[in-house]
Amino acid sequence: MSLRIDAVILAGGMARRMGGNDKGLVELLDKPMIEHSIDRIKPQVKEIMINANRNQSRYADLGYPVFSDEDSGYLGPLAGMITAMGQTQADYLLVVPCDCPLLPLDLVERMLTKIQSEGAELAVASDGKREQPVVLLLKPSLRDSMKAFLDGGERKIDFWYAKHHCVVTEFSDQPNAFINVNTPEQKQQLAEAIAK
């Protein structure tokens, strides 16, 4: 029996460091940043969903289901994950941000292998130096635990990981895979690096 893996792209933040511009819709090399993330993960999953709390019609134009956080108030990435976990029938949910245009093409394969080999509930990606807290593969059945954590006033996702059997999947062979864009300057640097 093959496993079903769906994905959610988190585009629900306020993007304060990008001058309030919706990061997923900021153009990078002539297309919205979120399209780069879609291109990288589409071959790896069955369904893609987009979590966005504004500009929903523009995201819907990309042809994927779009939903906002169940809890209003921009409570961070956990709120988007909780909503996505309630919308999928998949065995696993891949979570990625909208501003990582170089995600590994073997992201799901390596994270799933690590989960299965260690009997874990979730895997978080690492570039070899730092964990990437919003690049993870997890079982949607963890939704109640995550919701209780958020409802208890917690926001730090790594504190939630610590409550579960979480494994780190290292991608040190792809050191640029998790470069993200938080400022206009970073966007320019990344565009120049990709163009080389």
Swiss-Prot record:
Functional summary from the UniProt entry: Transfers a GMP moiety from GTP to Mo-molybdopterin (Mo-MPT) cofactor (Moco or molybdenum cofactor) to form Mo-molybdopterin guanine dinucleotide (Mo-MGD) cofactor.
Residues binding GTP, per UniProt: L10, A11, G12, K23, N51, D69, D99
Organism: Shewanella woodyi (strain ATCC 51908 / MS32)
Name of the protein this chain belongs to: Molybdenum cofactor guanylyltransferase
Keyword annotations from UniProtKB, A to Z: Cytoplasm, GTP-binding, Magnesium, Metal-binding, Molybdenum cofactor biosynthesis, Nucleotide-binding, Transferase
One record GO biological process: bis(molybdopterin guanine dinucleotide)molybdenum biosynthetic process
NCBIfam families according to UniProt: molyb_mobA (TIGR02665)
Catalytic activity: Mo-molybdopterin + GTP + H(+) = Mo-molybdopterin guanine dinucleotide + diphosphate
Family to which the UniProt record says this protein belongs: Belongs to the MobA family.
Entry-linked SUPFAM superfamilies: Nucleotide-diphospho-sugar transferases (SSF53448)
Known partners and oligomeric status: Monomer.
One of the Pfam families matching this protein, by short name: NTP_transf_3
Names of the cofactor(s): Mg(2+)
Domain notes: The N-terminal domain determines nucleotide recognition and specific binding, while the C-terminal domain determines the specific binding to the target protein.
Subcellular location: Cytoplasm
Principal place of residence: cytoplasm
Top-tier EC class: transferase
Domain of life the protein comes from: Bacteria
GO CC terms: cytoplasm
Gene3D superfamilies (UniProt xref): Spore Coat Polysaccharide Biosynthesis Protein SpsA, Chain A
EC number: 2.7.7.77
Record has Magnesium as a keyword: yes
Molecular function GO terms recorded: GTP binding; metal ion binding; molybdenum cofactor guanylyltransferase activity
